[in-house]
């Protein structure tokens, strides 16, 4: 189903965003490098919030390469992936890069395990383990870049990465939380390799994932192959005047997220 022209809450649609700033402005907002692998008309789209889930840790290290566990010095095995987020702000009908925003990113490893949590099914059990978790501050162009691995899977969820953006650019604390998803064909190809293959075939495709079905197509990455792995850019805009979106996830007991309300489900969120 094509959600390009469907409203999600107060979100701008792709068509509205293009009218807002014009195609030329959309192409130039973050520069051609970020947008080379994606549709340039999506630059100023306000994308949906989705649920935070139970595995966010607020003590993530400030670093770009999040593959290494700082406590052991060991890197998580997996196909290298560079995720580049271009963050903009919508103010008075104009879209501009948002500098100095704090971007958190966290995900499971190639066999579906989250670092730093004690969940017996998908947690590493070591509270000092911080692999595949980290934060970056957006630069003057609104860019934050993470070097990670293509994520694995765990029961009940499609393959995904969590991220959170915090800023006080509007004069008060603003927090946006969502998730990134991946094309099925690429996931099948990568998960057939080691170390992913040892975990078996995933049990939940995108269209069967309760979070993806809410708005996942608007947060679907389009990774492109590089000499060492893959890279995946995504641009998104924040409406800092939207207090409902900008309130802390802690206020909603980590169950808030656009229309993504709900409990932990079969295997965490």
Predicted regions and their residues:
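N-terminal secretory signal peptides
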Residues: 1-16, 23-30
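Alpha-helical and His/Cys-centered functional microenvironments
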Residues: 20-23, 164-166
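Boundary at the C-terminal end of the N-terminal hydrophobic targeting segment
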Residues: 36-37
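Beta-strand-dominated extracellular/periplasmic modules and repeats
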Residues: 40-215, 233, 237-254, 268
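Low-complexity, intrinsically disordered Gly/Pro/Thr-rich segments
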Residues: 213-224
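Extracellular interaction modules
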Residues: 226-231
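Long, low-complexity intrinsically disordered regions enriched in Ser/Thr, Asp/Glu, Pro/Gly
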Residues: 256-269
């Amino acid at each position: 189903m094509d959600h390009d022209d469907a409203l999600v809450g107060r979100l701008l649609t792709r068509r509205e965003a293009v009218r807002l700033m014009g195609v030329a402005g959309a192409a130039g907002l973050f520069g051609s490098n970020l947008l080379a692998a994606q549709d340039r008309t999506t630059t100023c789209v306000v994308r949906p919030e989705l649920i935070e889930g139970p595995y966010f840790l607020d003590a993530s290290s400030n670093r770009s390469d999040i593959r290494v566990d700082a406590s052991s010095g060991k890197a998580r095995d997996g196909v290298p992936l560079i995720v580049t987020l271009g963050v903009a702000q919508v103010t008075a009908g104009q879209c501009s890069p948002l500098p100095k925003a704090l971007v958190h990113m966290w995900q499971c490893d190639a066999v579906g395990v989250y670092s730093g949590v004690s969940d017996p099914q998908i947690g590493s059990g070591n509270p000092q383990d911080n692999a595949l978790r980290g934060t970056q501050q957006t630069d003057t162009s609104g860019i934050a870049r993470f070097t990670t691995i293509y994520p694995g899977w765990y029961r009940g969820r499609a393959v995904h990465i969590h991220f959170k953006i915090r800023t006080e650019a509007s004069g008060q604390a603003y927090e946006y939380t969502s998730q990134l998803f991946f094309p099925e064909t690429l996931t099948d190809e990568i998960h057939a390799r080691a170390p992913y293959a040892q975990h078996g075939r995933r049990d939940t495709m995108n269209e069967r994932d309760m979070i993806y079905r809410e708005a996942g197509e608007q947060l679907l990455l389009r990774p492109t192959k590089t000499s060492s792995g893959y890279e995946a850019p995504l641009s998104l805009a924040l409406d800092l005047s939207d207090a409902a979106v900008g309130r802390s996830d802690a206020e909603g007991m980590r169950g808030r997220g656009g229309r993504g309300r709900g409990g932990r489900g079969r295997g965490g969120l």
